[in-house]
Amino acid sequence: MSATLSLLASVVMVAAEKDYTKYVDPFIGADGGGYVFCGACVPFGMVKLGPDCNNLTENAGWQAGTDIMGFSHTHLNGSGGGCKYGNVLFMASTGDLDPNDYASPYSSEKAEVGMFSVNLDRWNVSARLSASAHAGFHEYTFPESDNSNIFVDLGKFLASIEMQEFVGSEVTILSDHEIQGYTRVRNGWNYSKAYTVYFYADFDRAADSFGTWKEGRKEPGRRCQSDNNTKSGAWFSYRTNAGDKIRVKVGISYMGYNKARENAMELKTWNIEDTRAQAVGAWNDILSQVDVESGDEDRKKIFYSSMYRIFLQPSDYNGENPVWKTDSPYYGDYHAIWDTFRATHPFINLIRPTTGGEMVQSLVDIYENDKYMPDARSSHSTGRTQGGSNCDMLVADAFVKGIRNVDYEKALDAMIKDATVPPGDDERQYGRGGLPDYNRLGYVSTDYERGCSRTFEYSANDYAIAVLAKGLGRTDVYNEYVRKASNWKNLWNPGISSFGFSGFAWPRNSDGTWLDDPEFTVFSSGSFDHQFYETFSWELSFYVPHDVNALIDKMGGREKFIDRLDTYFRESFPGKRDELLFYTKLVGLCQISNEPCFLVPSMYAYVNQPFKTAEIVRRILDTQYTSARDGVPGNDDSGSMGAWYAFHCLGFYPNAGQDVYLISSPVFPKTVIRMEDGKELTIVAKNTSDKN
């Protein structure tokens, strides 16, 4: 059994005494660019059942102020960019069903742990949703009507920029209370191969009439629409009295119909409150591992909501791998490790190390069966790689934290392949792009996209390889990669100045000359086709997490380093606003709405000034995070923003891949962290306040 499903007796006892889920608001971050998933799910659940407001929303499905299109069973949390998922969409209506026009305005929406509810105003129908790991529970309350409908639209999916593409679907009405089918989709943000989501739906009431449709053309009484690359759906209709409830259990699977039916059986009763209670119990098992004492109820709400989001992804796909047979743990929806290696996975490793180890082992298994460990992976396809081979950071972090349920010898093989074997034409999907330059020149030149940011990330990745190699007694590998971990110095240009400081990360041509472009500045930023991926030189120049002492020397010594940090958090951004991708949440030059800055506030610890870290962190916590629906400063990115907040509330922050936590100031007067092995860490912050 996977650790995700295991229970700790000591934690269960605590959970029974206190309901931590009452402090969780799944709507925090759903608006304002946080793209937080607000529907129903269990920790790491494969099913994430929630509303899709239109097919052009982001990955979480929710978009305030638009109509609800329906409720689909697959989502990601907090991810920007092109959409994935939004598969197997169910909806309810009244009157004559039009498969091309059924979206509804909504009201009275409410998101709670294990439950999402909303009124569909167009149809005078209320919906309640809950979920287990592999199944969704729907409950619809109807008005008096001769035609109350529940239907599934297999042609729907989320389809914003970098669009997913429809491939095919099939639907069959098995009886007057059962429907099964599948939808097949490809592409999206990770340019995935086609993936198939099967479903089996069981209704608690026999339909009075039924039918199917193909490409929007209804065929009443027809039981099946076969797959010929067309969009299909099916409906059940009922005569209802006011207040009648109809319930549906929907199991999904990536393996086939039998597994989908088996997964539906996770829902043992027809009482949605039972499903909700099981979800609440699963969440309390996790949330109770961090017990905070505080009279600040709003802060507790933000904290536990942040912690909740850490455990939404990656998704536990054990037993649901359609690509290869494996006895290894199998997790997916790493979206993306470039975001999550910094805080999300270290937090999981802190309180659920067995699960953290399973995740790392799943990455090793992916390497053995699909070329490389992924930087991102969803719908059982790898891609895309945003920067470095940052699985290396996850492996090193698990190793130095003493997590042992990982085959580290194979993990080291995977890391070395990252560092030595170019991915060829698949540079945005696999491995390290620009690797021939990096290994020949010691940096990725301007001949390749993202050359500067890749070089700095590869240097940190190489240090992670060295850490593991040393731990495994591979001295030769350690010596090679600890040397390569200094390659960032090859892109340190002492001739670049800003705000009175000299020496910054800077792109370099393959002939050794520096990039000379008057339009390119220390504030220039971009995406995949830029030299700085979602960062800029002022920020990237701090990214030497593995050798801060050498960085301090490059910046001119201790006092200059302190001055530069002070300036980074004090000065206003002087560049053109459109140069910065994620400028909406700036603290000085620090774009806390994006991950490359995550470690910087804690770097004062390396010059013995943690009090400045405490001041900066508290300012960010107080001004950039709230309990409102737009209360997350940027894309939550699989819990990354939540993990940054949660760690700093505890008063320490990880330097991922190292056995180091950097100290700041705890927010709560007392915190008890209950470890998986039964040990407890108690943090007491005497006289803590907004000013202390």
Name the predicted role of every residue range:
Residues 2-10:
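Bacterial N-terminal signal peptides
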Residues 15-345, 349-393, 399-456, 464, ...:
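Accessory carbohydrate-recognition regions in carbohydrate-active enzymes
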Residues 461:
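ATP-dependent phospho-/nucleotidyl transfer catalytic cores
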